Amino acid sequence: VDFWRTCGKGARNSRRNRPQTGNGHAIIVAKLQQCTACWMLTRNRRPPFVLRRLVLLNGRRVAPAANADPNTGQGQAYNLNTIPLSAIERIEILKDGASAIYGSDAIAGVINFILRKDYQGAEIGVSGGSTLENVFRNYTVNATAGFGDLAKNRYNVLLSGEYFSRTPVDYRQPNAVENNDYRRLASRDALTSTLSIIPNYYRESVRGNGVFNVGLPTDPRCPAALTVSATAGCRANGFDYIQIQSGAERGGMLVKGTMDFSATLQGTAELSFTRAINKFVDSPPTLDGTGVGSIWFNRAGQRFNFLMTLPVGHPDNPYAFPVGLRYRFADLGTTYTKTVNDASRVLVALTGTWGGWDVETAYLFSQTKRTETANGRLYYPALVAAVNNRSYRFGGVNSAAVISALNPYRTGTGKTEISSVDLKGSRELFSLPGGMAALAAGVEFRRESFDIVSDPEQVAGNFVGIASTTVGASRTVNSLFAELSAPILKNVETQLAVRHDRYSDYESSTTPKFGLKWKALDTLAIRANYGEAFRAPSLTQTSNSRVQSFSTVTDPVRCPNGSTPLPGGDATDCTGRTVASIFLPTTSLEPERSKSFSYGFIFSPSDRTSLQADLWEIRRRNQIDRFSAQQVINNEFTPGYIGGQVQRNTNPASFLTTAAGVPIPGTGPVETTVRRFLNLGETRVKGVDLDVRHRFSLGGGRVTLNALATWMIRYDYQLTKGGAFVNGAGNFYLFETPKLRGTATASYAKGDWSSFVRYNYTGGWDYNDPTVASGCYLGSTSLTLAYLGRCQVRSWTTIDVGTSYTGFKRFTLAAVVRNVENRRAPYDPNQTTLGFNPSYHNPLGANANVSVTYSFK
């Protein structure tokens, strides 16, 4: 779920102030609470440098999620569900790169959540929402109380608690995608899977070669509803079991106390705890006896391979020769995963004045813990025993004891921690023609750790086809920073900043930043910024870690023309086969470095009208990434290729053959790719941000108009150092990036009423592909260009409306309806499971949220 599209735009390089009326806060919180379709959220408005944006709470770091993404091997994303939303006063967003004060690793900027200060009173709120189809339901209850007046009582205590719940949504429930003919769009409503509850049998292509890829007649036990023909096999719709949104609930509390010890010394303590629980259901386990079977590795790197075959004489083998099976273990039930994420945070701070300095020092401890309990993966020792002793009947009735032995629960844990001590100070230095020069400086000592432990049985390799992720690492970072603000002329102000970081596991880094603002006219200010950033590799990329995943790939060796396999190959060489991938750490990685530039102006002809425009550019080099499994396979025989290695089946019976039927060594099906993180090429991104605001009086009320837009001029990506740059803006080659995104909002406030209407726009991107015959990439289904009517993902426009009312004493009523026209997400042929791109679109259609807040003031 894209935070900025679903939940409204954030502030620019300034602050979003919390509205003074309770209704504004209720609406902001309601919007934020809609952003929980995924348990782990990352925030990004510009290019997808998702893991390069720094998230802060009250100006200090938040521990990242205790999760290593098995698809990327990376482990530095943030779970924003752990932040107590009802206690938030405003959100600061710094978009111009790294910050000397906050951190040089914020290549893509900073998001800073600021808690309420000196709050007095109490309020309780309830909210709920759903779509028109009454799915994607969510409910929230929150309460906030504050007592003590700093000015009078010299103390203040803030208490905040919140509970959130959402219902699960089956994959086929929402009518989520345009052109919603599921049989043609990703085959979501069709019996396309031959992994069925009744086994489908396959014989060897050549007796004794161990390659089971010749289909046999459909089992007569197959129900009529699942039978396509006498030879097409028993079928299933794999989407029957999948959820597009998991069920979840979250509860959290925060306590913040502030006390003035004297006129020059103040103490603050914060304590927060949040628990988020997700329950996810997926398809029952399956096994495939065709191809190379299931391949996986244990923690030590030992390879396992299981091919689902039945010998002659097995009661479920009706043939006089060995057979391979494609089978869905439906009697084991759906796969169930429960994830519990706990986030704890303790902060103790002192602020005061000393020797002409405003001084602040603090100790921070931030921790996230993840416990995952899951089943739905076959227990290898029990599976081998069940096949050998015939205790499991394929397509028959099985005992509870056998089912339990095949499908035990497993548990994995993860933990990340950040602890730091810092000292900051600021003061005015001397007089300049434009005012007083001011200096801010400080030091920070920080320790980071990341640990992931998989279930011991999983580490040993005792679950069929499941990846084992293990991480254990820590490091310290010591930093010095300073920032000087110098109004050198009455209409010219400069800012100079520098930060020095020393990593225990990496080199030191010094990153400067420079800013200039020139007030050319009373109504016009021109500004420019230059900054550098430094991001050391994450702990999962360099430490004693091992991350495994699975990828679907085609094989250019066995299917060089992309459509017809060579002799000895099979159809999956062309259409795609699932292979294992192993990510190994790279201790020689160099840090990423970036430079950012921005130039813009602020034009304010009156106090009611303003126009801001910024041209920005980010250049990132030494980018840490890995080649995809497909890229590794495509370059298997490229001299000097360092992207990874390919491991193929070594059984000569699986090799390609010559015209005379002689096996060709080294041409077996791909089983595994071994990949490492590398310092690859460079990314250069350039765009324009626009912000137009105007307000005026009308009918005794006030109208506010606001338009925000980001235009991506270029997204140049260089895969390897010295290689060619490819522009990914507006196409699908790199990250499926639209060129234009924006909103236009009109709001009207009068008396107790406040309402708004907002227009949202997300541009499309093309799918032109010169490597295919049609010239247009259409995914892996039977779509035709004529059916879609264009070679692109369409642009998406939606309209939101909202209103709030404060006319009832102490009550605030608010309602928001998003996508009032019920426009479905545009179809994306590259998203073969969802059918839409979750980075920019959502499956909600028209959806509403209502809230009631009662204030005890």
Residue ranges and their predicted role:
Residues 2-65, 102:
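Extracytoplasmic beta-strand/coil segments of soluble accessory domains associated
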Residues 3-11, 79-81, 105-126, 141:
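N-terminal periplasmic accessory domains that precede
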Residues 7, 91, 111-113, 124, ...:
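Non-catalytic regulatory/gating segments with a bias toward low-complexity or hydrophobic composition
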Residues 44, 60-95:
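Short acidic/polar hinge/loop motifs at secondary-structure boundaries
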Residues 66, 610, 713-714, 759-776, ...:
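C-terminal beta-signal and adjacent terminal beta-strands/loops
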Residues 70, 167, 175-184, 211-248, ...:
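Surface-exposed, low-complexity loop segments enriched in small/polar and acidic residues
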Residues 83, 118-121, 150-155, 261-265, ...:
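Short loop/turn motifs that connect adjacent beta-strands in outer-membrane beta-barrel proteins
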Residues 144, 549, 705-806:
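C-terminal beta-barrel architecture of Gram-negative outer-membrane proteins
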